[in-house]
Amino acid sequence: MSQVVVCALYKFVTLPHYESLRAPLLAVMEASDIRGTLLLAQEGINGTVAGTQAAIDGLLAWFDTQEGLDNIVSKVSFDAQMPFYRTKVKLKKEIVTMGVEGIDPRKVVGTYVKPKDWNALISDPDVILVDTRNDYEVQIGTFKHAVNPVTETFREFPEYVKQNLDPAKHKKVAMFCTGGIRCEKSTAYLKEQGFDEVYHLEGGILKYLEEVKQEESLWEGECFVFDNRVSVNHNLEKGVYDQCNACRMPITEQDKLLPSFVQGVSCPHCIDKIPQEQRQRFIERERQVQLARQRGEAHIGSDVKQVIATRREKKDSLRKAQNEQS
C-alpha cells in the first residue's frame, strides 16, 4: 500500500469573493478523493488535507491557476493510513482565530527565519523563545528552553503578551508554531504592540523537522498534529500518542492503564470535567462504534460514503448467495 501524503497549507491573501471558491475547491478535492478540511475567509486559506501524491500535486496545481492562491505555503508528511474521515471546505471569518481586530499579516509581519538558521537564533541568550501553541500541544514536545504561555486557545495569546512581554525589556522575540500560520498573526500582533525585533520559524515545526537532522536538532519530544495521527516524530512519521475520543487530548499508553481511562468516554485529562449527561452520550456513542465494528462496518465517525458502500457490498453478497441457493 502506498503512503498517504498529508499536506498542511495556508496563505494570507485578500479573497474578496472567497465564498465562490468553496464549490469548485470541494469538487476538485472530491474528484481526487482528497480528505481533510480547508478554511476559506476573506483573509486567505488554511487547512490540512491528505491523499495520493498525484492527488495532492493536482490540488496544488489547481491553486496555481486561481488568482491569489498561487505559490501557496505547504508542508508535506506521510502516513500509512488516511488520517481524515471526511472532505470539507468551510467558510470562516478568520483562517486562524486570534480574536483581535485589525491584525493583518499581509501588511506587517515578523522576520522569517529559515530552519537551517533557527538554531543559531534561539541559542542567542538575548532572544526569548515563545511557543505560540496551546498547552496540550506544548506538553508533548517543544524547542529546548522555549517558554510555554499555557494557553488553552490561540485567543488567549494576546493576553499572555500583555501580561508577560514588554517591548522595552524583550528586545528580541522568536516564536514558532506547527506550520507557521499562527506565527503570522502572533508576530504581526507583537509588531503592532511596538516590539522591534520579532522573528518566527518559516514553515513552522514541521518544516524544521523535515530539513534539520535529528542529531543537530534542538527539538525535544513529538509534534502534535490536528489529524488522526495525533503526533509525528522527528522523521515526520506517526508518533506514540493516541487521542482521547471524549476531549481530543493526546494520551499515552500509560494513560490508558489508569482507572480514569475508559475507551471513547474519558481519560485522565477530562475525567473530572465531563458532565454526567455528556458522559452518557459518550458511552452510547462508544457502544455504537463497537456494534459497527462487530458488523464489519466502518467506524461511526468515518466517511458516510464508506459506511454506505460497506453496507451495499454486504447486501449484494447476501443477495448473490440467496440467488445461488434458489
Swiss-Prot record:
Name of this chain's protein: tRNA uridine(34) hydroxylase
Family of this protein: Belongs to the TrhO family.
Record InterPro entries: Rhodanese-like_dom, Rhodanese-like_dom_sf, TrhO, TRHO_N
Reaction equations catalysed: uridine(34) in tRNA + AH2 + O2 = 5-hydroxyuridine(34) in tRNA + A + H2O
Keywords: Oxidoreductase, tRNA processing
Source species, domain of life: Bacteria
Gene Ontology molecular function: oxidoreductase activity, acting on paired donors, with incorporation or reduction of molecular oxygen
Entry's transmembrane regions: none
EC number: 1.14.-.-
Residue pairs linked by disulfide bridges in the UniProt entry: none
